[in-house]
């Protein structure tokens, strides 16, 4: 009886320990899903273009990800980092494409190519950051795809706070500025007849 009780005591203690560990593991909460951001629904500040039939946006491999990227310029200006708990709803190029399609595409004939070269939150100091966007735009003819005009755009917008939401706001503002200035550029370069004729529907 005593030997059986001793055996039970050892096994029972082990079983209780396993159950206790399992119970504690069951109480551990799963990590929260990352917060997701887009560029917002800010309306365009200028009328849409009558020259553009379609927009194509491309980006390098390191920007074809929904990660919200940032850089500590004073620590290592070559290192790109990404927030763990915050991300874009889609890669920046896709978000920019959706914005430009809403603002620019209305039924013209020419095609607009946009190359995103940079899209990052930059920290020159611990308590200061900027949304940095660099873009190249090419207006191409409808028939042959020949380049009619090219222009580069660059933005460095101060973030209201030195964290992921602040970077999102600064980058969204930069895209809004780009959309407005791109529309103005298309209108300007499309004024000469040699560009407006092939771009406008007859």
Question: How would you label these PLM feature ranges?
Answer:
Residues 76-87, 144-184, 188:
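Short secondary-structure boundary motifs at beta->alpha junctions and helix caps
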Residues 1-24:
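Sec-dependent bacterial lipoprotein signal peptides
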Residues 25-40, 98, 102-144:
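Surface-exposed short loop/turn segments
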